[in-house]
UniProtKB/Swiss-Prot annotation:
GTP binds at residues 10-12, 23, 51, 69, 99. InterPro entries: MobA-like_NTP_Trfase, Molybde_CF_guanTrfase, Nucleotide-diphossugar_trans. CDD domains: MobA. This is Molybdenum cofactor guanylyltransferase. Keywords: Cytoplasm, GTP-binding, Magnesium, Metal-binding, Molybdenum cofactor biosynthesis, Nucleotide-binding, Transferase.
Amino acid sequence: MTITISAVILAGGLGRRMGGVDKGLQFWRGKPLIETVYQRLHRQIERISINANRNREIYARFGVPVFSDRLAGFQGPLSGILTALERATTDYVLFVPCDCPNFPLNLLEKLKSAVEFSQISLAYAHDGERDHPTFCLVSTQLKNALADYLAGGERRMLYFMQMHGAVAVDFSTEKQGFININNLADLNSP
């Protein structure tokens, strides 16, 4: 089974734990988080877009397509995922959050292997202790099911994933790669 894949950086949140600032545009190690995440992701895949609900013109400076959630009101990462699946011209979409600059460089390789080997529609990262559902590879065939799920008022990512037979992919040897930047103090950490 050969599948086509594109990628989306999720940067559409409200940044509540950061006082409402746009997380992706906050500086970490001398450059915006989104730039670090983009560069790391670009080492794994060429076709990248950014999901952002604010400051789209700034995100567009990276020279990739930028789109907002179709659903209004900052409804969470599943809203950005839905819009990405609806826009995609590939079989699958790889998602990564904008606030995790050290994610594994083998993320796509391992998630892709899982969906191909198991012939499933969805795989996400697990670090040996915790699930990381925003690091996921999702089939575009799930867009209607996700639209129905969100229309029913649900927002729980893992629940949706489990409903659709998702596989948690082991990244226990890359656990440090899933530490995210949650607050302004984290921006100054090494």
